[in-house]
Structures are given as structure tokens and as C-alpha cells.
Amino acid sequence: MLIKSQRLTLFSPLLSKTRRIPVNSHQTLVAESVITRRTLGAITATPSFHKNPVVIRRRIKLERVTRNCVRIDREIDEEEEEEEKERGDLVKQSIWEQMKEIVKFTGPAMGMWICGPLMSLIDTVVIGQGSSIELAALGPGTVLCDHMSYVFMFLSVATSNMVATSLAKQDKKEAQHQISVLLFIGLVCGLMMLLLTRLFGPWAVTAFTRGKNIEIVPAANKYIQIRGLAWPFILVGLVAQSASLGMKNSWGPLKALAAATIINGLGDTILCLFLGQGIAGAAWATTASQIVSAYMMMDSLNKEGYNAYSFAIPSPQELWKISALAAPVFISIFSKIAFYSFIIYCATSMGTHVLAAHQVMAQTYRMCNVWGEPLSQTAQSFMPEMLYGANRNLPKARTLLKSLMIIGATLGLVLGVIGTAVPGLFPGVYTHDKVIISEMHRLLIPFFMALSALPMTVSLEGTLLAGRDLKFVSSVMSSSFIIGCLTLMFVTRSGYGLLGCWFVLVGFQWGRFGLYLRRLLSPGGILNSDGPSPYTVEKIKSI
């Protein structure tokens, strides 16, 4: 068998002559080069091939490998592009699914929030058809009745959280005990408010008018004395409603409030328009509707398998637990209600017609305001499981906030347009007094600016409450209240009138929006903290 051989030419600057080394075609070139280097020491071997079949085959293999690598790389790029596109589609789909879930959840809740202001708005519309003095008297009347009831929303927060926690532990007995304790607290608070209204109602109305517009004091006092009879029913019904929400039952409370709204509307129509009872008739209609609503709330709770007529005295430890959860929320709500009330307080010194115009715009604003509150409730219901615990998912929480902000911005614009159009284009719905209508039209611009920010602001606030950033929320609200009240005093004394007061309200809303947004977008915010959550199950038992 013949073995073909070739000669390998070696060049070296250390050798004057060229040396040829035979190389068999079936031998490995690399090994031969290693042997040559070992033999010649520092001599470098540089092979020179001329149409070597082995080299040609290796080049062909190299080209094939290169082509395969290029093809595989191209396929990988295409797959990455497809995956990125799919991720984008999933993000869009996730946002869309979340938005649909939000709308489905907030539907019944929105109806519940609307019923209360709707009853006050019905009173405003009906009374406005008769007397301008009684319409102005509704200003301090609604503050001492409706606005004060919102101060007790801390009972609602405590009830829904504590009941939801007990049900999560599948401890129905504990849930029943907590409902009984909170029903007792609601009853005691209601009786105290009834007593305070009876004893200090006339003094409160007189102090609210600051010795001016004395003509509205008798009508306003009559209104709050009648409405005050419903205080125990209002707060007991509030606890029953919140317990149902903690059980994720929103239809029962919605039916109760819808029935109350219908009763209030029929009562106002019969007592005020047909029987001429005026503001007293409106107060009796609202009181009756609230009593019926409380009974239906408790009946709905009984249908869930709980005893809504069981009351239990809380222990000191239970009172401390409730106060620790509810105190920051109480400060926040109290600051907000106090600021709105202070605007009415400033308006009482500007004349009866100005106060009546503010009453109309304030009731319309409050009616539109509650449309955004379910977004806050949604954040408090869906965010906790994403922010801490075993199912912590910060990207999903950020996506949920994005969905809430999209809905909030859209809702704010819609509410701003509709809320401005009704008093602007159809003021006769509220009153036929030309002076009052003129004052209403002056407030349309700040009315739109303040209303458009509300849904987004409450979405951010609800997210912070879900993340248990309670100290920050309460500090923002309390500081905003102080700064806002000082600004209102300056504006009133400087002669800017009711228009200046409403622009202070614009600053109050947009200032809170900016502070909340900055807090959530900060690197150490609850939506951007990649470290372990500081809120463990042991520390937070009311989630």
C-alpha cells in the first residue's frame, strides 16, 4: 500500500536554510506541528497548502458549520422577535383583562357610592324649586349631617378588613364576633351623634353662619334635628354594609341603597312638591329612607348566615386593634371632610345667593366625586396580594395601577364635561333665580379642573392604602388641610370671593395627586421595592 507524502516547508529566521519535513496525508497536522515545535524549540511552523484534499474537506465542513450557525442565529432572532411581540400582546391583553375585571368589580360598588349623594342632590333640586333661603340652609345642614357621616368611614374600613381576614382563615365564628363588636361601636357612636345634635345643633348652625345670614338658621336647625334621628341607623347600617363587602357581596347593599334612593325621591316629591312641607319634608323623606336602608342592610347580612342583631361589648385589646387600623384612615377622611366644610364656612359670609350657588355646585361636585371612589376600593381589594405575601408580583401591581390610571383619566374627563354641562347648560334643573345661576356659571372652570383630577387621585390614594403607607397618606391629608385652610382665609379676606375658594380646591386636588404619584414612582416606593416586603402576615393581620 502506497502512502502519499508531502513536504512541509519550514521557515525560520534562526536558520539560513529551509528544511522540508515529510508529512503524511493521513496524519494530523496539528500533532505534526507540535512535534516540530518540540524539535526546533522556538521555531514557528507555518504550513503552506496547495490543493490539499484534507484542507478542502475541512473548509467545506467549516462553511457548512458557518451556514448552520448563521441560520440558527437567524432563527433565534426571529423567535426572540416573536416572543417579544407575544409579550407585548400579553401585556396589552393583561391590561385589557384587568380593566374589564375592574369595571365588573366597581359596577355594584359605584351604585352604592352614588346613592348617598343622589339623595342629597334630590333634596337640593326639590327644595331649590321653592325657597332660596331653604336652599341656602341646606349648606350647613348637609355639612352637619352628610359630611359628618363620612367621618365614620373608619368603621367601614375596619369592618371590611377584619371580616375579610377572618374569612380568609375560614373562621366564621371570629367573623361573627367582630361583626357584633363593630355593630356595638356603630350603635354607640350613632347614639352619641343623636345626643350631640339635640344638645348642640342650634349652636353649631349659628356658629357656622358666623352671625351672618341669620335667616337660614331656623330652617337649617329644623333640617339637622330631623335628620339626626337617623344617626344610630346610619352607622349600624354602615357596619352591616361593610361586613357584606368584606364577604364580597356587593349586590345586597346595592339593593338596599337603591330602595332608599327611590323612597327618598318619592318622599321629597310628595312632601315637598304636593304637600308644601319644604325643607322639613325633605329631611323626613331622607330620614325614612336611611332607616329602611339600614334594615335592608342587616337583612342582607342575615341571609349570609350571620346574626346582624347581635351586639358585643369590645375588650380593651379589641379597641386598640381597631383604633390602630382605623386611626390613620380617620385622620385622612376627617381632614378631607373638614376642608370641604371650611369652604362652605367661608361661603356663608358671602351672602345668601352666593351660598346657594355654592350649595348647588358642591352637591353636583359631590355627586360626580363618588364615581371615582370605587377605583380606590378596587385598589384596596386587588393590590394587597400583589404587593406582599406569597403571591407578590410587583410588575402585575404596576400594570394594575396603570389600568386604574387609564380608567381614572378617562372617567375624570367624562365627569368634568358632564358635570360642567348640566349646571352650565341646564341651570333651571336646580333653581330659577337669575342671581344664583350667574354665580354658578362663574365657577364652571375651577369646577372642571378640580373634578377631572379626582378619579386619578383616589386611585393613587387607594394604592397607598393597600400598601399600608398609612402615615404618608394621613400626613399628606393633614398638611393639605392646614395649607388649604390658611389659603382659604387669605383668599376670603383678600376679596377673591367664591371663585377664589374653588381655585383653592383645584390646588388641593392636584397637589395631592402630585404627592401621591411621586411617592409611588420613587425608587423606594411600594411598587418598586425589589427587596422582601416589610409587611408580613404576622405584622399585618387585617389585609
Curated annotation (Swiss-Prot):
Location relative to the cell: Plastid, Chloroplast membrane
Stated induction or repression of this protein's expression: By salicylic acid, UV-C light and pathogens.
GO BP term, pick one: negative regulation of defense response
Membrane-spanning parts: 107-127, 135-155, 181-201, 228-248, 256-276, 278-298, 319-339, 342-362, 406-426, 443-463, 472-492, 497-517
Gene: DTX47
A GO term from the CC aspect: chloroplast membrane
Signal peptide range: none
Function, in words: Functions as a multidrug and toxin extrusion transporter in the export of salicylic acid (SA) from the chloroplast to the cytoplasm. Plays an essential function in plant defense via the pathogen-induced salicylic acid (SA) accumulation. Also acts as a key component of the Age-related resistance (ARR) pathway.
Tissue expression summary: Preferentially expressed in the epidermal cells.
Record's protein name: Protein DETOXIFICATION 47, chloroplastic
Organism, scientific name: Arabidopsis thaliana
Annotated keywords: Chloroplast, Coiled coil, Immunity, Innate immunity, Membrane, Plant defense, Plastid, Transit peptide, Transmembrane, Transmembrane helix, Transport
